[in-house]
Swiss-Prot record:
One of its GO terms (molecular function) is structural constituent of ribosome. One of its GO terms (cellular component) is cytosolic large ribosomal subunit. This is Large ribosomal subunit protein uL14. It holds the Pfam family Ribosomal_L14. One of its GO terms (biological process) is translation. Coiled coil: none annotated.
Amino acid sequence: MIQTQSMLDVADNSGARRVMCIKVLGGSHRRYAGIGDIIKVTVKEAIPRGKVKKGQVMTAVVVRTKHGVRRTDGSIIRFDGNAAVLLNNKQEPIGTRIFGPVTRELRTEKFMKIVSLAPEVL
């Protein structure tokens, strides 16, 4: 569960290392975002010569959370940290590589590119 002011790791090679959630998109007073939800983030830590710079406001999709996601068979998939993938205005990933596993819940029409780039799909 990601809320405003939550810090997330970036799971792609866009140049950002850490981002902070500034808004959960998808409703006027929506408080929490889970895996597969789109959030507005600001870049807090970035590497030199990256595609994004510190202070930029971007859109991102949540790919891993400590809270996890519950499957229909009752199992819960949790991760050690919260991570997101940065998106451009067309909701496509900015980076060309994805680091770490992603869940099967991202396998929708919008995020198939992220699933295909990921090294492991749980």
